[in-house]
Amino acid sequence: MAAPAVSGLSRQVRYFSTSVVRPFAKLVRPPVQVYGIEGRYATALYSAASKQKKLEQVEKELLRVAQILKEPKVAASVLNPYVKHSVKVKSLSDIIAKERFSPLTTNLINLLAENGRLSNTQGVVSAFSTMMSVHRGEIPCTVTTASPLEETTLSELKTVLKSFLSQGQILKLEVKTDPSIMGGMIVRIGEKYVDMSAKTKIQKLSKAMREVI
């Protein structure tokens, strides 16, 4: 039963790799285009998973793949360019058997191994995650402050940020701390960037003072 899914994903990857339009390759376009090798693999996988209504399952499995490849022992045997291909294949087969990944995820791993692209796996996972984030209507937002925010302040900030979103969009907030900005905050939401840090204000003041003098 896995053969059609395997051959289908394989055809789609080759389709994007060669940019040749084929009548049988009716691809489901992802909500956002990710360029490069990783983008081509992720797009083909997104299309195949979407057709089978397994986007969430594949996303979960890919995150697990990324986690596994970060393990020192696995990385040493699978991502090391000096390790024989046969050894890598054996290691991957053992991992796939143990994790019981779906045919879609299994075939992606096998394709990456076959094409010598295992080093691009993390990039493919990242590209697929980006597609899924947009698919869910998530808007990435990063807030950087000099020190951790209090719960009340964070709650108020979330309310303000959500007011800028359109209906159906979901705020995906990440809060970071960076003492070097001295105070205030730096906000990046979607393609918008606002620097309200004390460091930048001081730099602007310093520049203005030098111009006056």
From Swiss-Prot:
Q: Which family does it belong to?
A: Belongs to the ATPase delta chain family.
* NCBIfam families linked: ATP_synt_delta
Q: Where is this motif: SIFI-degron?
A: 5-23
HAMAP family named among the record's database cross-references: ATP_synth_delta_bact
**Oligomer and partners:** Component of the ATP synthase complex composed at least of ATP5F1A/subunit alpha, ATP5F1B/subunit beta, ATP5MC1/subunit c (homooctomer), MT-ATP6/subunit a, MT-ATP8/subunit 8, ATP5ME/subunit e, ATP5MF/subunit f, ATP5MG/subunit g, ATP5MK/subunit k, ATP5MJ/subunit j, ATP5F1C/subunit gamma, ATP5F1D/subunit delta, ATP5F1E/subunit epsilon, ATP5PF/subunit F6, ATP5PB/subunit b, ATP5PD/subunit d, ATP5PO/subunit OSCP.
Tell me which species this is from. Answer: Plecturocebus moloch
Name listed for the protein in its UniProt record = ATP synthase peripheral stalk subunit OSCP, mitochondrial
Top-rank lineage group of the source organism: Eukaryota
Against Gene3D superfamilies, the record matches this protein to: N-terminal domain of the delta subunit of the F1F0-ATP synthase
The answer to keyword Ion transport applying to this record is yes
One GO MF term: proton-transporting ATP synthase activity, rotational mechanism
Q: Which gene encodes it?
A: ATP5PO
Recorded GO cellular component terms are: mitochondrial inner membrane; proton-transporting ATP synthase complex
Question: What post-translational events are described?
Answer: Acetylation at Lys-162 decreases ATP production. Deacetylated by SIRT3.
PTM annotation (N6-acetyllysine): residues: 54, 60, 70, 73, 158, 162, 172, 176, 192
Give compartment(s): Mitochondrion; Mitochondrion inner membrane
Chain segment of the transit peptide = 1-23
- N6-succinyllysine found at: 90, 158, 162, 199
- Do the record's keywords include Membrane? yes
Q: What keywords does the record list, in alphabetical order?
A: Acetylation, ATP synthesis, Hydrogen ion transport, Ion transport, Membrane, Mitochondrion, Mitochondrion inner membrane, Transit peptide, Transport, Ubl conjugation
Q: Which InterPro entries match?
A: ATP_synth_OSCP/delta_N_sf, ATPase_OSCP/d_CS, ATPase_OSCP/dsu
What is the documented function of this protein? Subunit OSCP, of the mitochondrial membrane ATP synthase complex (F(1)F(0) ATP synthase or Complex V) that produces ATP from ADP in the presence of a proton gradient across the membrane which is generated by electron transport complexes of the respiratory chain. ATP synthase complex consist of a soluble F(1) head domain - the catalytic core - and a membrane F(1) domain - the membrane proton channel. These two domains are linked by a central stalk rotating inside the F(1) region and a stationary peripheral stalk.
